[in-house]
Curated annotation (Swiss-Prot):
This is Uncharacterized protein MG353. It holds the Pfam family Bac_DNA_binding. SMART domains: BHL. GO terms for molecular function: DNA binding; structural constituent of chromatin. It comes from Mycoplasma genitalium (strain ATCC 33530 / DSM 19775 / NCTC 10195 / G37).
Length: 109
């Protein structure tokens, strides 16, 4: 890896493509196509089955439905109905959870 996690900005898509291209010897354009196809595949899987397992032990995406609810407008006192809403939830894998637990936060004591 060229960049470390101590940088202030996260890696951009083009930087990720460059790093993968150098590491694998595949052209950046081909890597871009691979990611585009992977994106389409994951979206189709998510729509058709409501669950999508991400590759390389990254975790799982799933669609859940937020229940309908009532909300009171604090200014007018009017009670509004909020309909059910589909949400995409991400469940990280065990290795990601363990790695995140080891991260030293800059605001921690």
């Amino acid at each position: 890896m060229e960049k470390t996690s101590n940088t202030s900005k996260p890696l951009s898509r083009s930087e990720i493509n460059k790093i993968i291209a150098v590491a694998t010897g595949i052209k950046e354009k081909k890597i871009k196509e691979i990611f585009k196809y992977l994106n389409t595949l994951l979206l189709n899987e998510l729509v058709s089955r409501s669950v999508c397992i991400l590759p390389e032990n990254l975790g799982k995406l799933r669609i859940t439905i937020r229940n309908a609810r009532y909300q009171k407008d604090m200014q007018t006192g009017e009670i509004r109905h909020i309909p059910p809403k589909p949400l995409v939830r991400y469940s990280p894998s065990k290795t990601i959870k363990e790695t995140a637990a080891k991260v030293r936060w800059k605001y921690a004591d």
